[in-house]
Each structure stands twice: as C-alpha cells, then as structure tokens.
Amino acid sequence: MNENLTRRHFLAATGTAALAAATTSALAAEGGSGGKPLKILGVSCSPRKGMTTAKAVQAALDAAKNSDARIQVELIDLGGLNIAPWSPKPPEDDMKDILPKFQDPALGGVIIGSPCYFRSLSGLAKCFLERLAPLREPKMVLADKPFGVVTVGTFRNGGQELTIEQIQAILLCYGMIPAGGRPPAFQGGTVLSTKDEISGDELGLGTARNTGLRVADLALRLA
C-alpha cells in the first residue's frame, strides 16, 4: 500500500515537473516572454472564505503565473459573498462587481474551484456559473477561452471527478475549451482535504498545479 502511494506521489511530482518544462520550452520556441499580458481568473466557489478550495485554486494560479512572464492571475474568493441564482430580472447582489472581470479583453483563461458536496458542485458554484449567462448573448464573450477545474473533497474518491464533469458541462455552454490535467488526474485538479487542510496532499496539489499549467499553456497558444 505504502509502495503504491509512494509511486503515485512520484508520478504526480514528475508529471508536474515535466509539464512545466515542456510548457517553458514550447513558449521559448515561440518567442520567449514578449507579447501582451494575459489574465487568468481563478474562482473559489466555496462558501468558506480562504479555506481549502481557495488554497487549491491559488496553487493552480501560482503554477500558471510561474510558467510565463506574460501570465497575470487573480483569485476571486466567493466565500461570504451574496450571489443568487439566475433570474430573468438580475438580482442586486455581489455579482455586479465580479461580472466585469470576465469581460476584460486581457482575459486569457479561467480556473474554477469547488468543494465536493454530496459528490456534486457547491450550490454557490451553480449560482455563480448561472450568473455568467449575460456573457452568452448577444455575443459569446467567453467562447474559445480555456478553462480548468479544481475540486476538493474530504475523501480521495469523494466525487472530485464527478464535480469536474458537472462544471465542464456548464462551461461548454459558454463555448469555452476544457483544459484537462496530467497523470494521475486527467480531468483536472482532484484534492483531498483532511481536517480543513490540504498541505499534506502533495499528490492532489500536484494535480491542481498541472491544471494551472495547462490553462496557461492553452491561453498563450490561443492568444
């Protein structure tokens, strides 16, 4: 058991390093770090501000930022904010300050993070993603922009990949391009929280970093 776990940690660590090296080499071949800056927004859709989901998304953002000088990042923590579901009459809530960030011409990609509640995305994540609806009409503002998903559960197999699939299905409705991860998590970041802490899950944090690197790589290639 311990031997298998050690092997998984080794594969995760080497996979992250290999992806970072490949991304750096590819970007260098395309002309180095010149060009316009690109913003990658990370959104923590946990009602608990600054907790494990926010930390996991930040790990993905840090990896993205460190991959190329053109990448700028920003974490949007929805914890403690009031965001209602979509309605024909737009609610007056905190979404009014968030939506303009997704209309920024410099936006290159998005990373969405959600805790796994009952093997599903959080209610806050669902409300937030619904409220991006104004970006679909009359123009698909987010079309052809890459996105990644990072999820946090209290069990290793606690619904993380199911939650990723649910968020991917929603963002495909916005015309966005899903960016997966690398072994051992091909769909995105799958992080384990133990007693409100993720720092001990190097395997899971590696998948979050891989997701950030993939989003950054695609954003730069599509720019």
Task: Please describe what each predicted stretch is.
Residues 2-5, 11-138, 186-223:
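N-terminal beta1-alpha1-beta2 submodule of the flavodoxin-like/Rossmannoid cofactor-binding fold
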Residues 143-184:
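Short, glycine-/small-residue-rich phosphate/pyrophosphate-handling segment
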